[in-house]
Amino acid sequence: MARFRFYGQLNDFLPWQFRHCRFMHALRGPASVKDAIEALGVPHPEVDVIVVNGQPADFTYRVQDGDEVAVYPPFHRVDITGLRRVGTDPPQPVRFVLDIHLRKLCALLRLAGFDALLLTDDAEVAELSATELRVALTRDVGLLKRRIIRHGYWIRQTNPELQFVEVLQRFDLADRMDPFVRCMECNTLLVPVDVDVVAERLPPGTRECFSQFHRCPGCDRVYWQGSHYERLVRLLEDARRKVRLKPDPTDAPCRKQALSGPAYIRPASSVGSAFRRTFRRARSRSRTNRW
């Protein structure tokens, strides 16, 4: 038997009786801490730091009877410089690969200017995430447990616009948006095009009302600031505002509280201070479309 404690958003993967508390877990023979963590439901890309008996450990550590294991997600505001991490930050700028069930989220990421690919096959999602160091986004926990995935995130929300806010917050992207530069259908960067080149493809009256047009080299769609443009601008601004107003769930354990509607997540206690306490000894010891 070993005692486990999961912090922050990692509790989202656990049965309710194991959330935000220490609990005993029976070991089924020799197992790495990675296997033990995933057996409890937490996919390895969501884990950033593991502490065993007060000392940092990596995924290969073999769990022993009597071990005290603390598992942490990535933190945005806790300085862990010099401490061993099992997670790594994705290369910048962040690029994504999404499974087919997140089609609407993928379109919103492209709208905001982010490189986001959409694939139908889970094996292809995992392979592309591994070879191109893209962040795999999915609602399928099992997909994130595939060994080859290094960077991945399980989308908690079910509403596409809230999913978009969630991704902006998790990867600190609210101020890195570059809207209306990618094709929302195929992800290709758009290029300016002269109106005379696409005039025959435009609805009547469009040429007289708009002066700037862009074409997608990938699928040949044409874009201009049509009737939906202002609504999309508001959508992006609302998302940025929500990120700034919403508490960062990576900085505190979260608990879900039932409301009249979908559950929401709110901070429960300071995981930052718990994280620093855990490491105090360890650090001293080791140093044709329209927008």
List PLM regions with ranges.
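Ubiquitin-like/PB1-type beta-grasp interaction modules and other compact soluble beta-rich domains
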Residues: 1-95
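BRCT (BRCA1 C-terminal) domain core and associated BRCT-interaction motifs
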Residues: 120-145
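Short linker/helix segments within small regulatory modules
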Residues: 60, 200-213
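Intrinsic disorder/low-complexity segments
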Residues: 242-291
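Short cysteine-rich clusters marking metal-coordination/redox-active sites
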Residues: 183-186, 216-219
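Short, charged N-terminal beta->alpha structural module
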Residues: 89-119
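Short, flexible, mixed-charge glycine/proline-rich loop motifs
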Residues: 170-179, 205-210
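Short functional micro-motifs and their immediate structural scaffolds
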Residues: 188-195, 224
